[in-house]
């Protein structure tokens, strides 16, 4: 899962740091509630994954529920940011399911526990092509959670790094 906040243009860096820190709290809390793992903060986005180090049979469902809660729960904070700074922030979430390698990567100076693989890359592409205020999932995730949620088929989406369009 990738969840990102779209930065408005011409935002003061100090104000943006305060805004994004508040937003991160809203992005991270549902991940932990559904027992996901926060892998990293990436500027204005988070990378989280479900299924490691603790796996659940319903990890794809947990990821989707966390994504939906992120979009829902950011709304009051968006209003607060609009009132305080006059800035509209938007959140979008991308989710994909697939095989990844999970473990510690880095060097003697810095190590992080993360997930690597094409499934993570596709989640990032889902986030980058999602409409603001939405959760966009891949067809792989859709197959795993289809009877549990209502979906809108967005058709085929061109994504960076893929030779063929991806169904979203």
Task: Locate each region found by the language model.
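Catalytic core regions of nucleotide second-messenger enzymes
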Residues: 32-42, 73-94, 156-159, 163
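Catalytic-core segments of nucleotide cyclases and related cyclic-nucleotide turnover enzymes
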Residues: 57, 64, 92, 96, ...
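Regulatory/sensor and coupling segments of signal-transduction and defense proteins
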Residues: 1-4, 104, 162
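A short glycine-enriched loop-to-beta-strand structural element that forms part of the catalytic core
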Residues: 44, 48-49, 87-103
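Conserved, well-folded catalytic cores of nucleic-acid-processing
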Residues: 56, 70-73, 77-80, 84, ...
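Residues immediately flanking
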Residues: 1, 52, 97, 139-140
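Catalytic NTP-binding/metal-coordinating core of nucleotidyl cyclase/transferase enzymes
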Residues: 1-69, 73, 113
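Cytosolic regulatory/linker segments at or just downstream of nucleotide-handling modules
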Residues: 100-102, 123, 129-168
């Amino acid at each position: 899962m990738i969840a990102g906040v779209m930065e408005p243009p011409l935002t003061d860096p100090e104000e943006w740091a305060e805004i994004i820190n508040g937003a991160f709290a809203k992005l991270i809390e549902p991940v932990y509630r559904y027992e996901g793992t926060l892998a990293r903060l990436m500027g204005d986005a988070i990378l989280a994954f479900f299924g490691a180090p603790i796996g659940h049979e319903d990890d794809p469902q947990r990821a989707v529920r966390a994504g939906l809660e992120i979009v829902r729960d950011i709304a009051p904070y968006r209003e607060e940011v609009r009132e305080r700074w006059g800035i509209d922030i938007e959140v979008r979430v991308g989710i994909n399911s697939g095989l990844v390698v999970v473990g510690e990567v880095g060097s003697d100076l810095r190590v992080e526990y993360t997930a690597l693989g094409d499934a993570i890359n596709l989640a990032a592409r889902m986030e980058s092509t999602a409409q603001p205020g939405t959760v966009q999932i891949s067809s792989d995730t859709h197959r795993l959670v289809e009877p549990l949620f209502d979906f809108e088929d967005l058709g085929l989406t061109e994504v960076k790094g893929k030779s063929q369009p991806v169904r979203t």
